[in-house]
Swiss-Prot record:
A biological process term (GO) from this entry: coenzyme A biosynthetic process
UniProt pathway: Cofactor biosynthesis; coenzyme A biosynthesis; CoA from (R)-pantothenate: step 1/5
Subcellular location: Cytoplasm
Family that this chain belongs to: Belongs to the prokaryotic pantothenate kinase family.
Name listed for the protein in its UniProt record: Pantothenate kinase
Main location: cytoplasm
InterPro entries, A to Z: P-loop_NTPase, PanK, PRK/URK
GO MF term list: ATP binding; pantothenate kinase activity
Keywords: ATP-binding, Coenzyme A biosynthesis, Cytoplasm, Kinase, Nucleotide-binding, Transferase
Organism of provenance: Myxococcus xanthus (strain DK1622)
Keyword Cell cycle: no
Binding sites annotated in the UniProt record for ATP: G95, S96, V97, A98, V99, G100, K101, S102
């Protein structure tokens, strides 16, 4: 099977699921069915087979990568006479709305923290770095929420820089999907983890210029490994609509929900609205800003129509 548009065969090793599964070797499965139930995203397929076939080999690869980074750090410590501080290994996970990147992040967190060499694994989403709704409204960006310009990029860069500088505590803002806004006064405090997983739509995007005198800092400057969760656009669109319909029957009915008004729509109206949101916001964002970053990832998980990973593409060293 040919690589996707924009991916050079010279850059990536392309593995079918069976070949990837064999790379698990003797890696044990530390999760039970009930653990996986708590990690599954709304409307997503996730079972023990998916964890064993896809995510155990990935956790093994990441453990090797982290171990190599730790050995390099130890060598640098010896070279410098013990004058540098160990810093978190940062894994970025990118992909479209509804593609399953949040589930991927939660699974990897659960697996990686069970490896003895790096038990402290934190997960942070970039949702908290969205500008608050009042700022987005003032800038006429509410319909561009999720696009690069809707994020406080400077705050996100500062967060990552402080982590890599070895700060004892670094705070990330908290986002509520229920109220569809950043929560004032709340923060997720990250305290020198062994690994930090950063999950978000546009984490692999190249930074815009902050003026004409010097290039901006890229988020990827801080990443040790990056993953792109991929699927065909028509599948992601269908998953998004199905997720919207499930949310309409559950979370949207909460009186605190920003989308409470949508809970009263009939089935056809809900589908029409979800299709409209995809066509006007999520689809263009995927095409213009998210999918073009795929080639920057170290590893790509390609899903089939059933949400199962069919192929894995690993960038050559």
């Amino acid at each position: 099977m040919a690589l996707a548009t924009g991916l050079s065969p010279a850059m990536f090793i392309d593995l079918e699921r069976d070949a990837w599964r064999a790379l698990r070797a003797a890696t044990p499965l530390p999760l039970k069915s009930e653990d996986i139930d708590g990690l599954r995203g709304l409307g997503e397929h996730l079972d023990l087979d998916e964890v064993v076939d896809v995510y155990l080999p990935l956790s093994r690869l990441l453990n090797l990568q982290v171990a190599a980074a730790q050995r390099l750090w130890a060598e640098q410590q010896a070279f410098l006479g013990g004058s540098t501080q160990k810093v978190p290994y940062i894994i970025a996970i990118a992909g479209s709305v509804a593609v399953g990147k949040s589930t991927t992040a939660r699974i990897l967190q659960a697996l990686l923290k069970r490896w003895p060499d790096h038990p402290r694994v934190e997960l942070v989403t970039t949702d908290g770095f969205l500008f608050p709704n009042d700022v987005l409204t003032e800038r006429d960006l509410m319909k561009r929420k999720g696009f690069p310009e809707s994020y406080d990029r400077r705050a996100l860069v500062r967060f990552l820089a402080e982590l890599k500088a070895g700060r004892a505590e670094v705070a990330a803002p908290v986002y509520s999907h229920l109220v569809y806004d950043v929560v004032p006064g709340e923060a997720q405090v990250v305290r020198q983890p062994d690994i930090l997983i950063l999950e978000g739509l546009n984490v692999l995007q190249a930074g815009a210029q902050e003026g004409k005198q010097m290039p901006a800092t890229f988020l990827s400057d801080f990443f040790d490994f990056s993953i792109y969760v991929d699927a065909h656009e028509h599948d992601i669109r269908r998953w998004y609509v199905n997720r919207f319909l499930k949310l309409q029957q559950t979370a949207f009915r909460d009186e605190r929900s920003y989308f409470r008004r949508f809970s009263e729509l009939n089935h056809e109206q809900a589908i029409q609205l979800a299709e409209s949101v995809w066509g006007e916001i999520n689809g263009p964002n995927l095409a213009q800003n998210i999918a073009p970053t795929r080639s920057r990832a170290r590893l790509i998980l390609l899903k089939g129509p059933d949400h199962k990973v069919k192929r894995v593409r690993l960038r050559k060293l």
